[in-house]
Amino acid sequence: MDIFLRSISGILVILGMILVGFVIGEKGWFDDKSRGLLAKLVTQVALPCYMLYTITQRFTAADLLKMLPALRFPALSMVILLGIATGVARIFAVRQDRRGLFISMFFNSNTIFVGLPINQALFGDASIPYVLIYYMCNTTFFWTLGTYLIQRDGEGEAQFDLKTSLKKVFSPPLMGFLLGLVMVMLQIKLPAFLASDLQYLGNLTTPLSMIFIGLSVSHVGVKQLVLGKDQLLILLGRFLVAPLLMASIVYWLPLPSLMKQVFIIQSAMPVMTNAPVVARLYGADSDYAAVMVTETTLATMVVIPFLMLLMA
């Protein structure tokens, strides 16, 4: 019960910040352009600083070398989820013009905008390396296979562009993580003033991310949130199939309990915030993607405490 109450407390912290974003969104403080600016501040400024500061200040080379082989667990989970999603889309006759988007949302999760703050709230900073390991896998899958599938919905015969995909995979947050990794391995220390700058900027990550989520919920509108077949299947995939699959992969293995818990929580995160953006770019069903981002984000706040209780 103590774990359940602690997880409820962590979720309430997150919900409070989301509520702030929702309220100012309803008041019309942010238009599409300013929402995009907020997302850029998080992904291109706050998150890279957060990654670089956290890795260089809190981990040793030995710590990181022990963790990197764990990449195989989220990778295996996502490959299996991709197969399951493809089968589910065919069995339940998901519309052809949104099938690729459906598959992408089924097997990819929002590991940074939502995953990082939630894991921090539940487990503290010790969870960050495991969060980043899952993120590395997730972002690679989304900007390669996921984007290809969404593009196929909008353009029919999609073409895979390796150069564009690599630019997306090696995003500023991942580059911040990799730079931190190199500095730790080479035992390069940050000057104190620079470390402080990175810490201040990095601390913007969680509040700005949650305010952005609240703004997104306001933008979609509560009236748009419906539970049709295609919506329910995504909810089941994100919050039942994905965590059960990850749990079945890691449960029996001699891994740190924190790693297992973080991987399971990360697998049960909502649909990626980038999904509607990519869908709009390629002429796919961006409204469906936006609704699913909102519905799964709200559902996460209910699901996570019960997941924590089960893992205890």
Feature-to-residue mapping (PLM):
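Alpha-helical transmembrane segments of multi-pass small-molecule/ion transporters
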Residues: 1-312
